[in-house]
Every structure is written in structure tokens, then in C-alpha cells.
Amino acid sequence: MADLKAFAEQLVNLTVKEVSELATILKEEYGIEPAAAAVAVAGPAAGGAAAAAEEKTSFDVVLKAAGANKLAIVKLVKELTGLGLKEAKDMVDSAPSAIKEGIAKADAEAMKKQLEEAGAEVELK
């Protein structure tokens, strides 16, 4: 048990360069992909690993409907996406459409809140 604790301590104290070298050794000498090793180690250890693995890390903000104040939604979409006015209007007109794709949960929720406050119907996927 003491040997494992010492090994764990050494592992935690590795520098980025040493971790890179370790990954190379594992791949070349043992045929273990570093990502596969992390999944293999973490998988059986945690009972709720399946639920944690399914938790999304990137979200798409989808405009389902512009609502009554379409002009405000077009301006907000233009501001949030950096698109030109025509592109933002076309995006709002073609609802349901993805406003932003693959963004962090906090950013997606903030964007959703802004759009909903302006009167739009928004969904996170």
C-alpha cells in the first residue's frame, strides 16, 4: 500500500514534459493510448461514471422562435454572433436555427437568458 501511495505521489508531481514523455512510452512500448488508459482507470472505480460520461461539455444555442419583438432579436443575434445585419436577420427568419454551436455551458446559458429576456424562444442542445 505504501508503494502505491508513493507511486501516486510521484505521478501527481510530474511536470508537463514528463507527462508527455510518459504518454509516449505508454503508447510506443505498451500500445496504450493515453485517453484509453484514463477511461480504463476511471471507469470501474466510480459507480456513477456512466452518468458523468454523458454530461455534455459543449452546447448549441438554438433559436426556436423570435417572438413578438423580432427586431430586438435580430440586433441581439448580430451582437452575440458577430454576424452582419443581413446574416443575423436571415438566421432569425430561418428559425429554428443554431445561433452558436459548441460553446461552454455557462456561455450557452448566458446567451439563452439574454435571448429569452428579449422575447425569443431558445433551446440548448
From Swiss-Prot:
<dbReference type="InterPro" id="IPR013823">
    <property type="entry name" value="Ribosomal_bL12_C"/>
</dbReference>
<dbReference type="InterPro" id="IPR036235">
    <property type="entry name" value="Ribosomal_bL12_oligo_N_sf"/>
</dbReference>
<dbReference type="GO" id="GO:0003735">
    <property type="term" value="F:structural constituent of ribosome"/>
</dbReference>
<comment type="function">
    <text>Forms part of the ribosomal stalk which helps the ribosome interact with GTP-bound translation factors. Is thus essential for accurate translation.</text>
</comment>
<dbReference type="GO" id="GO:0006412">
    <property type="term" value="P:translation"/>
</dbReference>
<keyword id="KW-0687">Ribonucleoprotein</keyword>
<comment type="similarity">
    <text>Belongs to the bacterial ribosomal protein bL12 family.</text>
</comment>
<dbReference type="InterPro" id="IPR000206">
    <property type="entry name" value="Ribosomal_bL12"/>
</dbReference>
<dbReference type="Pfam" id="PF00542">
    <property type="entry name" value="Ribosomal_L12"/>
</dbReference>
<keyword id="KW-0689">Ribosomal protein</keyword>
<dbReference type="Pfam" id="PF16320">
    <property type="entry name" value="Ribosomal_L12_N"/>
</dbReference>
<dbReference type="GO" id="GO:0003729">
    <property type="term" value="F:mRNA binding"/>
</dbReference>
<dbReference type="InterPro" id="IPR014719">
    <property type="entry name" value="Ribosomal_bL12_C/ClpS-like"/>
</dbReference>
<dbReference type="GO" id="GO:0022625">
    <property type="term" value="C:cytosolic large ribosomal subunit"/>
</dbReference>
<protein>
    <recommendedName>
        <fullName>Large ribosomal subunit protein bL12</fullName>
    </recommendedName>
</protein>
<dbReference type="InterPro" id="IPR008932">
    <property type="entry name" value="Ribosomal_bL12_oligo"/>
</dbReference>
<comment type="subunit">
    <text>Homodimer. Part of the ribosomal stalk of the 50S ribosomal subunit. Forms a multimeric L10(L12)X complex, where L10 forms an elongated spine to which 2 to 4 L12 dimers bind in a sequential fashion. Binds GTP-bound translation factors.</text>
</comment>
